[in-house]
Amino acid sequence: MKKKIFVLIVQALCLATGFSQNPRWQMIDKTLIPARADLDVRWEAPTKTIPSKVWIYRLLPNNFSPEAISNVVMLCSFTTTNRIEQNTNGTAFQSPDGSRKLSISFPSAQIHYETPEPRLSPTNLAKEVPPMSQLPELTTNLLKQVNIPLSAVTGFFETDKFNFWQPLTMYYVSNTIITNIAFRAVNFRRTVDEIPIIACDGGSAYFGNYGKVSKLLITWHNFNRYKSSPTLKPQAIIQLLRQGKALQEPVPLDVGYIDWPTVKSVTIKEAKPCYFAGDTDWLYPFLWLDTNVDTGHGIVDVGIDCPIIDETKP
C-alpha cells in the first residue's frame, strides 16, 4: 500500500513539474522580454475576450469513426482494393501507379492525402477548378464528411471560419498573357472552449481539376480535461511583463531589433487567449497580446505571448 501511494505521489510531482514548463515558452523564434520594474505598460484592451478560467488538456489519439474513414476514402477516389495497410494504428491507401497516397493515423490523429503536383503549361491548363465562391460550400461539406462540427473551426488573420487562397501562374505567349490557377485552397484551425489552437489541430484542403480534392491534411485529436485554473487579471499580466515573463514575437525586418531596456512604453490594444501544444501531448493556454511599443524612435506593432494563468502553481 505504501509503495502504491509513493508511486502516485511521484507521478503527481512529475505532472506538476511538466505543467510549469508551458511548451509555448520553448519556441526558438521568440525573444524573451528582459525584466524591467519601471516598464511603462498601459492596458487599453477589452477584457471580455478573456474567460474567467481556462483548462489544460491532454491530447489523445483519434481512431476516427468508420463513417468518417469511409467518406474520406471515397472523397479521395479510393476503394477497398487500394488499401495497402490496416492495423490498430490506422490505415493507408495507394493508387495502382503509386502516385496518390492516403494515410489515416490514429496515434497522431491525422488524415493525410497527397497527389503529384500537376505539370501545367500554356497548352495544359488546369480544368474546371471551382471558383472561390464555391469553396465555403465545398469546405463545409468536407468537414461534415469527417464529422468535424463547424462550431469547432475558426480561421486565421481575424477571419471567420476559413481562409481561402489560390496560386496564380502567368504565361506570356505570342504577346498574350495567359493566367492559370492550378487549385484553390482552404486553411482552418481548431478551437476548444471557443479558444483557437495554434500550430496543432486544424487542416487544409486543395480543390483542383473538376473540383476534386488534390491535397488534404487534417489533424484532429481527442481531448481529455486535466485541470482548470482561473485566468490572471490585467494588473497581474502587466506585472508579468515587468518581471520578464513574456515573449516578443518576431517583428518585420524593417523594424529591426527592439532595445527593451530603452523602450518608452507598451500599450496593450488587444488580448486573446490561445492554446498551444508544440511537440508535447499537453494543450496549454497562453495569452497573445497585440501591443504598440514606443521605442523612442517610433511606434511599433508587436505581438507578445505571456501566461494567462499562474504557472507556478501545480
Where in this protein do the model-derived segments appear?
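Charged, low-complexity helical/coil segments in non-catalytic cytosolic or luminal regions
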Residues: 205-284
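Positively charged n-region of N-terminal signal peptides that target proteins for export
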Residues: 1-4
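Preferential activation on post-signal-peptide N-terminal prodomains/segments
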Residues: 21-183, 189-196, 219-227, 310-313
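A cross-kingdom marker for long, charged
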Residues: 273-314
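Short, well-ordered strand-loop elements centered on a beta-strand within folded domains, enriched
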Residues: 110-114, 210-220, 283-286, 297-306
